[in-house]
């Protein structure tokens, strides 16, 4: 019964929020591979994205409008008077970063095995000014992807919302299976770190790709090259 209500509320939010979304976000969607442009997500999947603004999840509700999109939300969001109840109605998974409670991982795997689409922001928080983006990925994202065995759709946003001069830009990549990123001979713990880093690399490369396509690098904060690395590139 709760699953049905989540689907109904999700669609209610999309229908009532469609016009405000068009006016406030003005999102242009691009694809790494244009052959998948008109395809829809079939079956369970993880939408794995960089995290620039609080509204990233809202944008994906409309970008992937054909499916009911669920997400993970930190405890700080649930404490907000209006936002907390809204996230609950949308079926968000509660993540308490203040404790070592990883039950959200198993809950995420359970939802994916039931056929849902889940948005994950592996950085686990918004970046601060000057921090290299994307932030290091939490290994919990790799665990969920490996344990569930569902395809991961990498997505990048420039986070340009509520901006009349510059449109929001979203780049959708080709699906990736986490199992294909595992390295033989490594322990499970090592592979969680390896897979997380590989996913981060995919998102980082896509962010660079989006910047090239749009001519806008304002959402990028790159790692400074060491002197010896600069000599090699010169």
Where are the language model's segments positioned?
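Short, glycine/polar-rich helix-capping loops at beta-to-alpha or helix-loop-helix junctions
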Residues: 13, 78-83, 163-165
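A conditional alpha-helix N-cap/helix-loop micro-motif detector
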Residues: 98-101, 134
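Structural motif corresponding to alpha-helix initiation and N-cap regions
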Residues: 29-32, 80, 102-105
């Amino acid at each position: 019964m709760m699953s049905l209500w989540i689907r109904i509320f999700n669609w209610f939010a999309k229908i009532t929020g469609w016009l405000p979304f068009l006016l406030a976000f003005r999102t242009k969607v691009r694809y790494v591979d244009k052959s998948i442009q008109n395809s829809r997500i079939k079956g369970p999947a993880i939408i794995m994205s960089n995290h620039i603004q609080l509204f990233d999840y809202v944008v994906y509700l409309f970008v992937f409008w054909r499916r009911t999109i669920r997400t993970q939300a930190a405890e700080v969001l649930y404490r907000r008077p209006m936002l907390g109840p809204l996230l609950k109605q949308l079926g968000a998974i509660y993540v308490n970063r203040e404790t070592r409670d990883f039950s959200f991982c198993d809950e995420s795997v359970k939802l994916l095995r039931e056929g849902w689409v889940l948005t994950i922001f592996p950085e686990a928080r918004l970046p601060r000014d000057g921090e290299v983006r994307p932030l290091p990925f939490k290994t919990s994202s790799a665990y969920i992807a490996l344990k569930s065995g569902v395809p991961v759709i990498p997505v990048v946003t420039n986070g340009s919302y509520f901006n009349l001069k510059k449109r929001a830009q979203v780049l959708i990549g080709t699906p990736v299976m986490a199992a294909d990123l595992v390295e033989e001979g490594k322990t499970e713990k090592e592979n969680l770190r390896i897979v997380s880093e590989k996913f981060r690399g995919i998102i980082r490369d896509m962010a660079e790709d989006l910047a090239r396509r749009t001519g806008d690098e304002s959402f990028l904060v790159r790692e400074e090259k060491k002197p010896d690395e600069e000599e090699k590139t010169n």
